[in-house]
Design a protein with these regions (language model features):
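The canonical Cys-X-X-Cys-His
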Residues: 45-55
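Outer-membrane beta-barrel pore domains
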Residues: 165-168, 172, 285-479
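Outer membrane beta-barrel
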Residues: 59, 89-110, 120-252, 269-274, ...
Length: 479
């Protein structure tokens, strides 16, 4: 691939990376030509901006490429036509400095002595750190047979398969029939795996993973990758898209258990189902819009069949669902995304009551909640993006109204980030990111930044407010 040569300014930036980490919050980035994600750039010779709003987020052309099974629908698609030295792999990791803080936490009166009483207080910590590492293999095995395998580790190099699937594309010579089997991300309204924000409190979508207080449903949320099969289709420009997936009720875990290697949580021998429909259209000089709807419906066990006291498989399965809608608007340098979700867990799941023990009390009910997010991105150039997001979740019905106040678990979160790419070439890319996120929740911690407690555990009333924040400076790179 003929890529653009780095300018002298870019060379100086690369040589001065340590100083840039400290100065990144006030740097004024100079626009540079942006190229592609390495693996596919080397294969097709296209600039990164052809497929990406900003790596790793896709634009509509990139969505079409992905929907086609990582194919441009030309003579370069089959790997047999590529140079033998071509290998479809990308490695990504993020060295970083971050600070995490939360109030109304349990603080021992005498440090090191948990028996000497405690009081509510604020806990903070900061320092240099690493993200996990992704080793991503993806491409085509043959014309119209694509694959992805993504071994992913945490900060301590403990690996798991984030995804691993094979997809048969354009069945019966039509883009409306594509079949995938394995472990994969659901076709969500907004992909969490391509999220640009990375901080402890801002590096995920809360509504994709929310579980009410004391809820026993083992389902981790629609943001978790799942094991199963998917039928999907789209028109030529992916303005009209659909997916339907049938999934094992394992929350993405292998081995027919709900927790990796934990025999105490076997699967419920049921299937879950997910569907998503999306329609895009031009708005006559006002950009491009997409609207859509989605739903996840499943069952989870409330007790287990045992053998000599050892749980073998789940029984007493009860239903739950997540359903909602989306709206996205691409206009000039702006991208606005919004997602709404309504959640429901059956009363037995929500209260952790085995369904073979009798009836529920008069105060025990199904858990219901509503939430979502609104995110805006200002795309100054393909190398410089500013992101802001507001998220909210509100309980509409608690599982047990006799003990849990109605607003317990409600949250509001705000995240703002600045992401600048000094370079992105066909062999490697680098992004400097500065980010701040803030979360307020009622009664119970819903944050992701490293602290967690109930207000009552910290000696406060159930209706206290827990606030947490994350400050993040990172160097996100792939090659």
């Amino acid at each position: 691939m003929n890529s653009h040569s780095p300018s002298k300014f870019t060379d100086r930036v690369v040589s001065a990376v340590p100083a840039l980490v400290l100065l990144a919050a006030v740097l004024l980035p100079a626009p540079q030509p942006a190229n592609a994600i390495p693996a596919f750039a080397r294969k097709y010779g296209l600039p990164c901006s052809a497929c990406h709003i900003g790596w790793p987020e896709l634009n509509n052309f990139g969505q079409v490429f992905r929907d086609n099974g990582y194919q441009m629908m030309n003579e370069r698609d089959s790997p047999i036509t590529r140079d033998p030295s071509y290998f479809p792999i990308t490695i990504r990791i993020t060295p970083q400095w971050h600070r995490e803080s939360a109030n109304n936490q349990i603080v021992d009166n005498s440090p090191g002595n948990g028996e000497g009483g405690s009081h509510p207080g604020t806990l903070s910590t900061s320092g240099f750190d690493l993200s996990g590492m992704d080793i991503w293999f993806a491409g085509t095995l043959y014309k119209n047979i694509s694959f992805s395998a993504l071994p992913s580790s945490d900060q301590n190099a403990s690996f798991h398969f984030e995804n691993a699937f094979v997809r048969f594309d354009n069945l019966l010579h039509t883009p409306w029939l594509n079949f995938k089997v394995g472990k994969f991300e659901l076709d969500l309204p907004v992909s969490e795996k391509r999220l640009l924000t990375m901080s402890g409190d801002g590096g995920f979508y809360y509504i994709y993973h929310f579980t009410p207080l004391n809820d026993a449903n083992p389902f981790g949320g629609i943001g978790d990758n799942q094991l199963g099969m998917e039928l999907a289709g789209h028109n030529a420009n992916s303005y009209t898209r659909y997916t339907f997936a049938a999934l094992s009720s394992l929350d993405g875990n292998p081995g027919l258990v709900l927790s990796n290697g934990n025999p105490a949580n076997p699967a419920g021998r049921t299937f879950d189902y997910y569907g998503h429909f999306e329609q895009g259209f031009n708005t006559f000089g006002n950009g491009f819009m997409k609207v859509g709807a989605y739903s996840y419906f499943g069952f989870a066990p409330t007790f287990f069949q045992t053998s000599n006291g050892v749980p073998i498989y789940g029984r007493g399965n009860k239903p739950f669902y997540r359903a909602g809608a989306e709206w996205k608007w691409y206009f000039n340098k702006w991208l606005v995304k919004s997602v709404y979700l309504h959640g429901y867990d059956n009363a037995f799941l929500a209260n952790g009551v085995p369904s073979n023990t009798g009836t529920l009390s008069a105060t025990q009910r199904a858990a219901k909640w509503n939430g979502g997010f609104l995110e805006g991105q200002y795309i100054i150039s393909p190398q410089w993006i500013i992101i802001a997001r507001w998220e909210t979740i509100h309980m509409s019905q608690q599982a047990d109204i006799s003990i849990t106040p109605g607003d317990t678990g409600n949250l509001n979160a705000f995240t703002i980030a600045n992401r600048w790419y000094p370079f992105m070439f066909s062999r490697a890319g680098l992004a400097l990111q500065q980010e701040y996120s803030f979360v307020r929740s009622n009664g119970v911690t819903n944050q992701g930044g490293g602290f967690g407690t109930l207000c009552t555990d910290a000696g406060r009333a159930f209706n206290c407010t827990i606030s947490s924040s994350s400050l993040f400076f990172g160097i996100d790179f792939d090659f």
